[in-house]
Amino acid sequence: MIGSSHAVVALGLFTLYGHSAAAPAIGASNSQTIVTNGTSFALNGDNVSYRFHVNSSTGDLISDHFGGVVSGTIPSPVEPAVNGWVGMPGRIRREFPDQGRGDFRIPAVRIRESAGYTVSDLQYVSHEVIEGKYALPGLPATFGDAQDATTLVVHLYDNYSSVAADLSYSIFPKYDAIVRSVNVTNQGPGNITIEALASISIDFPYEDLDMVSLRGDWAREANVQRSKVQYGVQGFGSSTGYSSHLHNPFLAIVDPATTESQGEAWGFNLVYTGSFSAQVEKGSQGFTRALLGFNPDQLSWNLGPGETLTSPECVAVYSDKGLGSVSRKFHRLYRNHLMKSKFATSDRPVLLNSWEGVYFDYNQSSIETLAEESAALGVHLFVMDDGWFGDKYPRVSDNAGLGDWMPNPARFPDGLTPVVQDITNLTVNGTESTKLRFGIWVEPEMVNPNSTLYHEHPEWALHAGPYPRTERRNQLVLNLALPAVQDFIIDFMTNLLQDTGISYVKWDNNRGIHETPSPSTDHQYMLGLYRVFDTLTTRFPDVLWEGCASGGGRFDAGMLQYVPQIWTSDNTDAIDRITIQFGTSLAYPPSAMGAHLSAVPNAQTGRTVPFTFRAHVAMMGGSFGLELDPATVEGDEIVPELLALAEKVNPIILNGDLYRLRLPQDSQWPAALFVSQDGAQAVLFYFQVQPNVNHAVPWVRLQGLDPKADYTVDGDQTYSGATLMNLGLQYSFDTEYGSKVVFLERQ
């Protein structure tokens, strides 16, 4: 917890270049979402205040406060001394720090003029308040009407370079969320180059702070990393062309004493799928600056006269109740104001994916047999994975066929239509008339050199002039910056989905981007990809789309605009998945996680974990499925029971609030609780990863319940919410890998 001396500072800094001034009074309460008083601005949420003002002498925007609720007049800071090399701009908290005028910290924007200058002097011109939250051109964005959000746009202008910048601040008060983005427009006669652009820059007052991020690699995504913010620059990002497995575009700044359920935390999440940068700098004066936006190494964006570059959005969420509270605010906001799919909050079908069951080795007869066995298990959706396409270059391994999206005639002599019809005529076991649904795997952004498409259009693959085209997994990346490539993907996907009965698409992407012709290609690629997704998801709203980038490589808020679920990791080992899924939930709702029960020994780790444990871990994702050959399932008698349990918990997983009760990095007994929005139901997932010999299993205290209500636990004993939260529950486990799913219902 922050002590009282820190709390005074946190009330806000009101600083002018060269002198201090009395802070303006902006209303006596937070009754209005956005309040302006001349050139002072207040954004007010249920539990958050965001304040800044214009320096009347310089036109610069000065940060006053981002944190807990403040009202009325806020105190002025002590006037900073100006000594040494650091000028006044480097000694204050700035809203949109530019470069070249004495602030030696990381800038939010760096512009190179045609003459070579990189100095900017963006000054306040005007502002406007807009009801609701508007879309961004060509980019995914949060949305909301006048009841949900209010937007402040501050217009800046550089009189020397004729560059304009529009800073957008949208507040969703119910979620204590501020959403920021920037438009930079060249209003001059010559070309300019945007070398760096952050969607958000926050200068925190002097305090000791920690930073939290998600690091990893393929099959090892979303490991939580926490470290002390040191003097100097620290940070992370992606240069892979995508948000990537390596680092996720999520950052939290927290008080050192902050835990899951206590303390101040600020969460930042970029609504973007491309290369990004997240940087934190503690400057010489002790202020901490946090920036998220484009990766400057992969931008270099040319703007001709009249042209505009729009940054991705960054969502900033505040809570004084720990990281768990920040996560729940992200989850609610994204479910209601980012994810556009009709499936975002609706029950997901239990699925079986063919990949780990048969890999590339199948034909029409064997795939129909696999579907029949799936329906007999009680599965509702059968997904045919990689290996169904390619004529001259059949897809019988990963070294050929990508780009040739027609059924392999050797495997499907009559095409896919009769296969889909046969499978969707199967009745799901345990139902009277529910028919099995059919889904399919595609990897539209990729091409194998061994393909007809590549032989006809080698220029469509990303390449840098004469340099060799580096293959990964025997494939190259199509250049989605090209409209012709975008149209090709839209057209073949339309032909595949139109009138075929396919109701689910798994969209894969199994490598990073290499050999781009220019740094700006990365963002051009993303704009093309977003156009493709926007077109297809609008054209086929009844198709359930799943994003998959070799598992986890594009698990980001940008993708969630178009797809309601994402394959969380190619690692399906249940022990590893607990860590991956808990980490992913720092920013992203469990409803968006694809999680499957796979065969053992696990293909990635070689570990053997009990069937029930694997199932319980997978149930914590919004899309539960099986990734195995049904004929090899052990313990057939428990499969219908577990599938029924998965269907029972799914509505609470999709729309409930997640409480991470005990973290896998801290305990051998990780636990999570999901509480329905109305508080009437809850489901506890409790695991034992490794027992301690001759040691009691610890009690687990629940959270998020009504302390005055009574709850029935698994239809048996009844306890008060206060008892369950202050004392908790205790269970014993008979095996090394033990698990329990416990239902609670409010009386």
Swiss-Prot record:
The keyword Transcription does not apply. It is an enzyme of class 3 (hydrolase). Glycans are attached at residues 37, 47, 55, 159, 183, 191, 363, 425, 429, 450. Its EC number is 3.2.1.22. GO terms for molecular function: alpha-galactosidase activity. Gene3D superfamilies: Aldolase class I, alpha-galactosidase from lactobacil brevis, Golgi alpha-mannosidase II. The active site is at residues 508, 570. Residues 1-22 form the signal peptide. GO terms for biological process: carbohydrate catabolic process. Its cofactor is Mg(2+); NAD(+). Keywords: Glycoprotein, Glycosidase, Hydrolase, Magnesium, NAD, Signal. Involved in galactomannan degradation. Homotetramer. PANTHER family: ALPHA-GALACTOSIDASE C-RELATED, GLYCOSIDASE FAMILY 31. This is Alpha-galactosidase C. It comes from Aspergillus niger.
